[in-house]
Amino acid sequence: PEHKVRFSFDWNKPEAHYCSQCKHYWTGNKRYDWAWVNVAHTHNYTYLRNCMYLYLATGNKVYAEYIRNMLLDYASKYITYLDHDTARKVGPWGGKMFGQSLDESAWASDVCRAYMVAKSIMTTNEIREIEKGYLIPCSKLLLRRRGTANWQVWHNSGLIALGVALENDSIINVAINDPECGYHAQMERYVMDDGWWGEGSPTYHYYPLRAMLLSADAVRCRNINLYDRKLYKMLAAPASGVYADLYFPAHNDGWYGESFIAQVSLYEIAYQRYNKDPFFLSVLQQCYRYTDRNFGEALQNNIEIPQVTAMAAWPSVHFKETGYAVLRSGTK
């Protein structure tokens, strides 16, 4: 707090938080202790996601067992967690693991994918325990959280993931088709015709876009196709409006320094789902001039991306609804 650096996380010290600058453990502050819980759940999320990709890549059953064991542990505890918001009170936007239903939804969106990947090695009783202890209680919580904009987009993503995991089409239907809060309602209300999210900033555009991609991918197994023209435009618009160095301008309430390269994993999915779209191929090639292709989403793609060394000569573009324009000359 004095040196403006993040505390070093220690699994064994939930109530003592080490500052690398002053070499001191900070104790006696409940807000720091609550933050430790937040970080612990986030580390577990990363662990489950990594195990999912490792199991898919290697077929080694041990990674599926890691997923099963952690989810069984969560299932034994989740219902004991109190509903709370960021002030540790019961509120309309609180969660159980996190102080925001937004974070609860994001966690569920990916963790349910890990569950589905590992489900085949689980017994009937283990599946029932995870459903009763985590999947069903979390879905009930999120069904009570009716918001707008990026919050609701993530609520829907979490609900879709939970609905698919539970094979419950009624949950999926609410998340997609609810006239006020569903996926289609949010897409209609907040995505402009030129593809930009209503806030008009890459910083805020990609946050709901990832939830929408997760939603679209999740329901493919239920024979629902959300990969329509509007989602395509949501992916293409910011990519079309990037600087030659693959950084975004600082428009609306965003800020300069936002890198397009940080979003390349989303275009691995887009390239595959939109039938090897040539623009998305060019996007991937340009990004991989600057970074390694080591994203988990590349495993889902399983397609060779030819390397290029030259900068792309993308055309000038005018986003009529948003009011942005990019003038280009060759690669500049």
Regions found by a protein language model. Give the residues of each.
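A mid-sequence, solvent-exposed acidic-amphipathic segment
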Residues: R144, T148, I171-A175, A185-W197
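Alpha-helical cores of eukaryotic small-GTPase signaling modules
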Residues: G158-Q186
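Extracellular glycan-targeting catalytic surfaces
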Residues: P1-G147, V153-I160, I176, E180, ...
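Short amphipathic alpha-helical interaction/hinge segments
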Residues: Y78-L82, M187, V191, V242, ...
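Inter-helical turn/loop segments and adjacent helix faces that build the functional surface
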Residues: A57-T58, A118-E129, L166-S170, A218-Y227
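Acidic, serine/threonine- and proline-rich low-complexity regulatory regions
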Residues: Y190-S201, V219-I224
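Secondary-structure capping and boundary motifs in well-ordered enzyme cores
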Residues: H43, Q100-D103, W151, P179, ...
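Carbohydrate-active enzyme catalytic cores, enriched for enzymes
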Residues: I160, L166, Y204-K332
